[in-house]
């Protein structure tokens, strides 16, 4: 089962084209300016089968056009990498473009496999400066930067996303 917080149909912000955005529950970061603070607790959300999510995506496929698809966001989707892998394989088999919006802070064999199945990774860099990153998120940015380097080395498509928040991440350097 996949622990889902909520859905957004016809999303236009989280990847190219029109997208079904699936917000997953749970995040190891504690960002001071979190856009989805209700997704942080791993105990929230609704247990949902991969089949239910697949059916929802397939039913909306006509609206995706050539550029759209499905985006998994959160929270932090890689916390549920093992449960997402079979779903990503089914989505690919159905010709649905997959984006994964991640902070890149988790790494293991399952996360690597999940990223390999993803068509486009949306990598959120919270702060490049290590000290400010820890202040903003409660975590180191070392793994996030290693994830960016891995994506680059693999030639895997990704977008770096940096949220500019006055007073938090709007430093001149």
Task: List PLM regions with ranges.
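Generic, well-ordered alpha-helical segments
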Residues: 19, 45, 49, 76-79, ...
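Auxiliary Fe-S-binding modules of radical SAM enzymes
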Residues: 1-16, 55, 166-173
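Canonical Radical SAM [4Fe-4S] cluster-binding loop centered on the CxxxCxxC motif
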Residues: 6-8, 12-48
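A short linear-motif detector with a strong N-terminal bias
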Residues: 1-3, 49-51, 99-102
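Glycine-rich, flexible loop/turn motifs
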Residues: 3, 9, 44, 60, ...
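Conserved alpha-helical substructure of the radical SAM core
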Residues: 37-69
């Amino acid at each position: 089962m996949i622990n889902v917080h909520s859905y957004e149909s016809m999303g236009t912000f989280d990847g190219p084209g029109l997208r079904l955005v699936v917000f997953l529950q749970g995040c190891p970061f504690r960002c001071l300016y979190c856009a989805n603070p209700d997704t942080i607790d791993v105990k929230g959300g609704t247990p949902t089968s991969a089949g239910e999510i697949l059916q929802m995506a397939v039913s909306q496929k006509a609206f995706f056009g050539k550029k759209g698809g499905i985006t998994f966001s959160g929270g932090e989707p890689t916390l549920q990498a093992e449960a997402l892998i079979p779903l990503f394989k089914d989505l690919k088999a159905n010709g649905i473009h997959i984006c994964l919006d991640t902070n890149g802070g988790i790494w293991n064999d399952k996360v690597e496999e999940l990223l390999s199945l993803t068509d486009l990774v949306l990598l959120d860099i919270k702060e490049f400066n290590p000290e400010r990153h820890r202040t903003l998120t409660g975590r180191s940015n070392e793994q996030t930067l290693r994830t960016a380097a891995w994506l680059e080395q693999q030639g895997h498509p990704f977008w770096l996303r940096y949220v500019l928040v006055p007073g938090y991440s709007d430093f001149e350097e």
